[in-house]
């Protein structure tokens, strides 16, 4: 896991996108124009969660090092220390990939 000095707030999650495959199973190279936007990422940092109507904090089900599937067009792209990250809201996370 990368050591990043970015701490997400509330229900925000900092992820590093896992690069999509550049070749097919048969060895064909996939051109950039044909690649789909990746939707899988590794969680780098997790915010503490949002507050409910009564002021109780609702923790997130996601933790650092989880691999997640996220909404294709969700999040905000961030470049920090020469590395690209994506800052997502918890609602942008669709699933956790079990190892």
Curated annotation (Swiss-Prot):
InterPro entries, alphabetized: Chaperonin_GroES, Chaperonin_GroES_sf, Chaprnonin_Cpn10_CS, GroES-like_sf
Domain of life of the source: Bacteria
Swiss-Prot/TrEMBL keywords: Chaperone, Cytoplasm
Keyword tRNA-binding found: no
SUPFAM superfamilies per record: GroES-like
Gene Ontology molecular functions: ATP binding; metal ion binding; protein folding chaperone; protein-folding chaperone binding; unfolded protein binding
One of the protein's GO biological processes: chaperone cofactor-dependent protein refolding
Free-text function comment from the UniProt entry: Together with the chaperonin GroEL, plays an essential role in assisting protein folding. The GroEL-GroES system forms a nano-cage that allows encapsulation of the non-native substrate proteins and provides a physical environment optimized to promote and accelerate protein folding. GroES binds to the apical surface of the GroEL ring, thereby capping the opening of the GroEL channel.
Family, similarity comment: Belongs to the GroES chaperonin family.
Protein name: Co-chaperonin GroES
Protein source organism: Corynebacterium glutamicum (strain ATCC 13032 / DSM 20300 / JCM 1318 / BCRC 11384 / CCUG 27702 / LMG 3730 / NBRC 12168 / NCIMB 10025 / NRRL B-2784 / 534)
């Amino acid at each position: 896991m990368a050591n990043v000095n970015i701490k997400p707030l509330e229900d925000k999650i900092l992820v590093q996108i896992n690069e999509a495959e550049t070749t097919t199973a048969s060895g064909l190279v996939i051109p950039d124009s044909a690649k789909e936007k990746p939707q899988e990422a590794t969680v780098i940092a997790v915010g503490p969660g949002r507050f409910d109507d009564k002021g109780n904090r609702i923790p997130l089900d996601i933790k650092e090092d989880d691999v997640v599937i996220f909404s294709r067009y969700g999040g905000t792209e961030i470049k920090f220390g020469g590395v690209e990250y994506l800052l997502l809201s918890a609602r942008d996370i669709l699933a956790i990939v079990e190892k």
